Each structure stands twice: as C-alpha cells, then as structure tokens.
C-alpha cells in the first residue's frame, strides 16, 4: 500500500518553494501533525500492518519526515503508531540541529553535497551528534533534486538557501539518482521484510 500525503492543497497552497521561510502558511508543525494523523489512519485500515509503515519525504517533505520522527516533539513522543523507517531526501536540517533530534526510528538521509538550497552540512551535523539510528548518504557534485532526470538549473525565484536572495540550483545527478534509488529500495526491503 502507499499513501501520498498532501499538506499543501487542502490549505490553499500549490507550492512553498518561492515563499520565504517564516512567511509560509503551511508550517512544519502542520506537516508533522499531518504525518502523525496519517499513521493513525493507516493503522485503522484493513490489510495494513501498522508495524510496517515507512515515511518518505523530499525537500520540505524531508524536513517533515524529521519532524514526524523527532522524539523531542511531545506529539511524536506520545504517538502510538510510528513508522519503522524514515527516509528524507535533501531535507532542511537546521531547525532539528537547533532543537535537538532524537530519532524514533531508523532514519536515512540522502543529501547532495553541492546543495545550495538545503545544505548537507546541518544534516551531517545532526547525524554526527549521536542519533544512533540516523544514516547519511551524500554525493559530491549533487544539488537539490539530484534524483531528478533533468539538468541542473538555477532558480532565481527561490528566496531561501545558502545565499538568500540569490536563488538556488536544482537538478539531476545520474550517479546520485541511481545510488539513492537503490539505497531506498534496499532500506525498504530491510525495514519492511523483517
């Protein structure tokens, strides 16, 4: 089974990439609560094994993965249903580095080392600060969206990133795309078949 969670459309948003951090109407708190609610809903569905749920997210959704698995959030700590695996592609990790991160489950972070939108360094710091359940895979020369098939392009319309107001780069990196896809399949097989 697969459930695709849309935190934006029901709140009247089509995208948040061009919105400055701090002005977004859809927050990480809402996205975390959406994910926690989705776990509860999934657990109540016939044919769903609530002990075999994986949570995946990309970019802002990747940050939501971290929020939904951070035991430092009281609602996560209280959650009855938790995913067995969490995978975040190029998440923003700065907020979790500041507040502290305690993983509720096995967590895989996949990062581009050239990412100037959501840089890899804070995620590497987060993983290095002791969460024993966090694994990082990172690729040299890979930008945000490295698992895409399109070329790297500059997005001047994105106000956030390493150099605020100067835009960011986004696009595919064939080696990182292939390796991350295989890493995802391997992680899902390990987590969900035991």
Identify the role of each PLM range.
Residues 133-194:
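C-terminal catalytic histidine-bearing segment of alpha/beta-hydrolase fold enzymes
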């Amino acid at each position: 089974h697969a459930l695709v969670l849309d935190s934006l459309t029901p709140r009247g948003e089509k995208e948040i990439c061009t919105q400055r951090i701090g002005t977004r109407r859809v927050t990480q708190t809402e996205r975390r609560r959406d994910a926690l609610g989705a776990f509860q809903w999934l657990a109540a569905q016939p044919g769903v094994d609530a002990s075999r749920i994986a949570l995946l997210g990309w970019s802002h959704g990747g940050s939501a993965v971290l929020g939904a698995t951070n035991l430092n959030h009281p609602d996560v700590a209280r959650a009855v249903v938790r995913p067995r695996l969490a995978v975040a592609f190029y998440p923003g990790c700065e907020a979790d580095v500041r507040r502290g991160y305690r993983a509720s489950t096995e967590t895989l972070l996949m990062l581009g080392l050239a990412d100037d939108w959501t840089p890899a360094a804070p995620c590497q710091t987060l993983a290095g600060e002791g969460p024993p359940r966090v694994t990082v895979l990172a690729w040299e020369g890979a930008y945000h969206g490295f698992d895409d098939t399109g070329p790297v392009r500059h997005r001047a319309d994105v106000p956030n990133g390493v150099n605020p107001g100067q835009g960011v780069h986004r696009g595919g990196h064939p080696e990182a795309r292939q390796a991350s896809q295989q890493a995802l399949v391997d992680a899902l097989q390990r987590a969900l078949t035991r």
